[in-house]
Every structure is written in structure tokens, then in C-alpha cells.
């Protein structure tokens, strides 16, 4: 995009009540695409992520990374004067994004019905660990909690050991992306109909989208297939995963129609006709 070209979301204003990672990822995507994002930080300390990853000049690189291009204002949300400022901002915004525990926005009289009284076509995106409704809704949670509930944790690590966790924010970031896409769709819907939306985006729901085959294998087989952890390897395809080699660890993804190519690269074409090596299922047993 050239310097003089208008950004995709120029003219869209987002009021951002989010902290940590999932919510800030959602609003950062809007900021990166040219929307005006106004981040509300709770006085007196501001966003708590300002206190971590202080690598240089006493500034949090975590906070910088996940809040790029945003404006910021520190407001005491427990003070009537602070809430008055918030209520002045809302009619001027297209979107409100929050990731408080479900019920907190209602406690501040900032739930969707209240927001609609201030701006009839407002779009509210509520991001939480376990959803806005249902038996788990009132429980607080983080990425790894939702990951465990979803069954994803059970698929990471070696089958004969306890599950592991990935040291990256898979759930938070993917939930932020889901939220941003939902808001973009709501903006399109509003342009067509004049109506706003309340979007319920949960880490738990988004984690289910990360199950490539586990859920449908188990449900489709009537429970006969029990997906298991495969350690360094994909549990149902081979070769697929990390393998030890003379020069160090390598990543191979040569299953199905790529198997002949790998055999040729290894100068092992005899494996193409060798019993026990013909299908992915046969090769999985041998890895």
C-alpha cells in the first residue's frame, strides 16, 4: 500500500476495553488496517501488561507489540466522572470491544442494550474464555484453561506422558482473529441493514476450530476412534512431523501423494513396493 493510499478501515472508530492478548489482538488488527482505536486503560495503573517484558527504556515490549497504532486514555471506571467520559465517547464510535469477565459490562451499565440507547447501530464484540452464556460463562479463564476444556491440550505431547502446552498464544491470537473477522462481517451487515450486533467470541469455541480431525474422527466413528497424542509426529499420517537426522532435527511432511517424492529424494524407491510401507496407516505403525 502506497503512503498516499487510504487504509482499508479508515473512518472506523473502535473503543477498546481489552487487556492481555485475545482482545488486544482483535483491536490491533483494526488499528493495523487504519481504524482509529481508542484504548481505555483503567486508572491509576493502566493496562497491567505494561509491567511485563520491560526489555529497554523501562517500556513493556509485550504491550507495544499487541497495542500497535492505538491511541490510549487512562480512565477510572469506578468514578462517575470517568464513566461520563466513556459515555461521551461511545456515540462517536462504530465498535466497542471488551474482554471483561461476563457480567462486568452490565455492572457498568455498558451492556449491549445500554450501548444501543447511546448509539442504535453500535457493534459490541465481547471476548471471553468460555462464552457469555451457559454453565461456564461466569468462570474466569485464560488461554490454557480454554485449551484444556477444548481437548487441544490432550493432543500435545507424547502419549505415554502428561499433556504439554505450546509456549505460544494460539488460543488468544486465533480468538482475536475470529473476533476481528466477526466485527468486519457485522460492519458489512450494518452497512446493508443499518443494524448493529452483539458478538459473543469465546476462546473455547475458537479452539474447537483448531481441531483438524480429532472431533470428527471421534464423533463420526461413534466413539470408536480415540485421538491420541503423537509426540513429535502426526498420529494418523506418516511421515509427518519432526525426525532426528545426522545433521540435526528436520521437519518432514511427505504423506499421501508426496511419499514417492520423498522416496526418490532419499534414493529409496524400493519402499514404494515394499509391504508394510505402502499406505499412511502402515507407515504410522513403523514410526
Residue ranges with predicted function:
Residues 44, 130-131, 203-208, 247-248, ...:
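Glycine-rich beta-alpha junction loops
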Residues 46-48, 221-227:
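Short Pro/Gly-enriched beta-strand edge/turn motifs at strand-loop
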Residues 132, 160-170, 191-207, 228-235, ...:
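Conserved Rossmann-fold dehydrogenase catalytic segment
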Residues 1-195:
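N-terminal helix-loop segment corresponding to the beta1-alpha1 unit
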Residues 238-287:
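Aromatic-enriched alpha-helical interface/lid elements that frame and gate functional surfaces
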Residues 154, 176-197, 209-222, 263-273:
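Oxidoreductase and adenylate-handling cofactor-binding alpha/beta cores
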Residues 76, 98, 201-204, 252-255:
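Active-site-adjacent beta-strand anchor residues
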Residues 183, 234-237:
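C-terminal substrate-binding/catalytic lobe of Rossmann-fold NAD(P)-dependent oxidoreductases
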Amino acid at each position: 500500500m502506497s503512503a498516499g493510499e487510504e487504509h482499508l478501515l479508515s473512518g472506523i472508530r473502535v473503543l477498546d476495553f481489552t487487556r492481555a492478548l485475545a482482545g488486544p489482538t482483535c483491536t490491533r488488527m483494526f488499528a493495523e488496517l487504519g481504524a482509529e482505536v481508542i484504548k481505555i486503560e483503567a486508572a491509576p495503573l493502566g493496562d497491567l501488561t505494561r509491567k511485563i517484558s520491560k526489555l529497554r527504556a523501562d517500556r513493556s515490549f509485550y504491550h507495544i507489540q499487541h497495542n500497535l497504532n492505538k491511541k490510549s486514555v487512562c480512565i477510572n471506571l469506578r468514578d462517575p466522572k470517568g464513566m461520563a467520559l466513556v459515555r461521551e465517547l461511545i456515540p462517536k464510535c462504530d465498535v466497542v470491544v471488551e474482554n471483561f469477565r461476563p457480567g462486568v459490562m452490565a455492572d457498568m451499565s455498558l451492556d449491549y442494550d445500554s450501548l444501543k440507547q447511546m448509539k442504535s447501530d453500535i457493534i459490541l464484540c465481547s471476548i471471553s474464555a468460555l462464552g457469555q452464556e451457559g454453565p461456564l460463562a461466569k468462570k474466569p479463564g485464560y488461554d490454557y484453561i480454554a485449551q484444556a476444556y477444548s481437548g487441544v491440550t490432550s493432543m500435545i505431547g507424547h502419549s505415554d506422558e502428561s499433556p504439554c502446552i505450546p509456549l505460544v498464544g494460539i488460543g488468544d491470537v486465533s480468538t482475536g482473529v475470529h473476533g476481528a473477522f466477526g466485527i468486519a462481517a457485522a460492519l458489512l451487515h450494518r452497512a446493508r441493514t443499518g443494524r448493529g450486533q452483539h458478538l459473543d467470541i469465546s476462546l473455547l469455541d475458537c479452539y474447537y476450530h483448531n481441531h483438524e480431525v480429532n472431533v470428527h474422527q471421534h464423533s463420526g466413528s461413534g466413539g470408536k476412534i480415540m485421538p491420541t497424542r503423537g509426540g513429535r509426529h502426526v498420529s494418523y499420517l506418516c511421515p509427518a512431523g519432526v525426525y532426528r537426522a545426522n545433521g540435526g532435527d528436520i521437519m518432514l511432511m511427505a504423506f499421501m501423494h508426496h511419499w514417492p517424492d520423498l522416496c526418490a529424494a532419499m534414493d529409496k524407491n524400493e519402499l514404494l513396493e515394499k509391504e508394510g510401507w505402502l499406505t499412511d496407516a502402515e507407515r504410522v505403525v513403523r514410526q
